[in-house]
């Protein structure tokens, strides 16, 4: 939360009243629409913190790139087919999953404020103009390119104003050799970085001065 606090303190110092604060528009990009308790509550926590400061806040309604075809497709398909009879027989599992997804959707509709436009993948997102005073990536594993199907949208490359990351994670992949050059290029565009993994943060600071 440190990078967010530092930024909001800077804004509060320059804002004379709540009316001025309300004119400050904050856009949050995160994995906001999966039925997962951790992802949902950490997204809502950041959202509520900024709203309490008096800012106009919304989630950028962005979906990561669709999975790319790979050589493991045949193996994955076979694995899914072998597990299909078990899932079909487990009707209670299906009902529980459906009930959970419905409950999450109701919660999101009640507590989230989304951008008016939905962006599906990088190609559509990069063409958009985002008019936020500040844009925030975080938290969750947005910097884990293996998890996000190489989605660069979570790095907000089309944001020209102030941009920070809040407690963003690289996941188990860390800074892998294949993605390191790409990640460094994307990370350098941030005004402030808050990273969850201490070892990665120290590595970025010592090797790249980030």
List PLM regions with ranges.
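Helix-loop-beta element that forms the nucleotide-linked donor phosphate-binding surface
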Residues: 201-210
């Amino acid at each position: 939360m440190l990078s967010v606090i530092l930024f909001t303190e800077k804004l509060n110092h320059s804002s004379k009243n709540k009316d001025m604060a309300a004119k400050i528009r904050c856009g949050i990009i995160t994995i906001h629409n999966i039925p997962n308790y951790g992802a949902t509550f950490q997204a809502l926590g950041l959202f509520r913190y900024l709203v309490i400061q008096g800012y106009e806040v919304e989630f950028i309604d962005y979906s990561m790139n669709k999975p790319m075809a790979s050589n493991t497709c045949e193996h994955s398909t076979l694995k899914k087919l072998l597990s299909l009879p078990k899932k079909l027989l487990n009707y209670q599992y299906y009902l529980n999953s459906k009930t959970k997804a419905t409950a999450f959707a109701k919660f999101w509709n009640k507590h989230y404020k989304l951008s008016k436009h939905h962006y599906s993948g990088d190609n559509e997102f990069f063409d958009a103009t985002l008019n936020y005073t500040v844009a925030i990536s975080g938290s969750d594993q947005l910097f884990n390119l293996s998890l996000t199907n190489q989605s660069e949208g979570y790095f907000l490359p089309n944001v020209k104003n102030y941009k920070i990351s809040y407690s963003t994670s690289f996941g188990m992949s860390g800074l892998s050799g294949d993605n390191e050059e790409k990640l460094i290029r994307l990370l350098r565009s941030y005004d402030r970085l808050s990273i969850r993994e201490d070892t990665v943060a120290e590595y970025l600071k010592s090797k790249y001065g980030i």
